[in-house]
Design a protein with these regions (language model features):
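Second-shell loop/turn segments in exported
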Residues: 34, 68-79, 144-146, 237-238
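Short, well-ordered beta-strand elements
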Residues: 1-11, 61-64, 88-91, 156-157, ...
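N-terminal lobe/hinge region of extracytoplasmic solute-binding protein
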Residues: 7-57, 202-203
Length: 259
């Protein structure tokens, strides 16, 4: 188990990683939700939910082959659903739906993916109520408009506007993170996603957040169904929020934190 401090000024602002643009959120949420790809300590792209990826036309079309053993779980590690290619479609629809995400993290997909800007502008013409009912399901306006294909549950294809040989680096960013439509439905619709918390969100990452006391403490608990069985994880990680580095040092001296 690990216990460490964080300044209270770096408190989490949202549990919806697709909405966040804040590094304080990312350092928490990226432990809870996994993307297609990650960068290792040397900056090299490594597999995450995508086990294979590539382009055969100079970056115009990108194909990602997904693992078939990634699960969405609840706070207590109970299985909710499989994580599939459709969750990445749902995530992208959320990002480029004007009334769902307030234009946060929209710029890269709109500039790179075919039809993304067209769909984004279309959602602007709708009322907030209409736009929030849209989904990325089969036969949806999103799937018909945007350059994303799902030949099967574990294959994801993006069509770029022009050749983007670096598009795989974008697959590490929150603009291409997944979201489960099952979670959206369980929460009661899009309006409740922005305000979701650690107790009702779904997880597919290394940890779940089993306790959250705002401005005080967060407890991350190892996800028992995490796909990467070779990853060395702490059973729990406790983050104690402190008012200053002086307070953190006092806690360290008293043995209440590890560093």
């Amino acid at each position: 188990d690990l216990v460490y401090p964080r300044l209270a000024t770096r408190e989490i602002a949202t549990f919806n990683i697709l909405y966040s643009q804040d590094s304080s959120d990312f350092e928490n949420l990226t432990n809870l939700v996994d993307p297609l790809l990650e960068a290792d300590t040397y900056g090299k792209l490594v597999p995450a939910i995508a086990k294979e990826w590539g382009t055969e036309d100079g970056g115009l079309t990108w194909t990602f082959k997904l693992r078939d053993d990634v699960k969405w779980v609840d706070m207590n590690g109970n299985e909710k659903a499989d994580c599939t290619a459709w969750d990445f479609a749902t995530g992208l629809e959320w990002i480029i739906n004007f009334h769902k995400n307030d234009s946060n993290n929209t710029s890269m997909p709109v500039e790179m993916i075919k039809g993304a800007e067209e769909y984004y502008e279309y959602t602007k013409t709708l009322s907030p109520e209409e736009a929030r009912t849209l989904t990325a399901g089969e036969g949806s306006r999103f799937m018909e408009t945007v350059g994303i294909e799902i030949p099967d549950d574990y294959t994801l294809i993006y069509h770029c506007i022009t050749e983007k040989p670096y598009f795989d680096t974008v697959a590490t960013y929150v603009c291409l993170y997944p979201m489960s439509q099952g979670m959206v439905d369980e929460l009661g619709g899009a309006d409740n996603v922005t305000s979701m918390n650690n107790e009702n969100m779904w997880y597919n990452g290394a940890y779940t957040m089993t306790s959250y006391i705002q401005g005080n403490e967060k407890i991350f608990t190892k996800n028992p169904l995490y796909w990467d069985k070779e990853c060395n994880l702490f059973d729990t990680v406790t983050v104690k929020m402190v008012d200053s580095n002086d307070v953190a040092f006092q806690l360290y001296q008293s043995g209440e934190i590890d560093y």
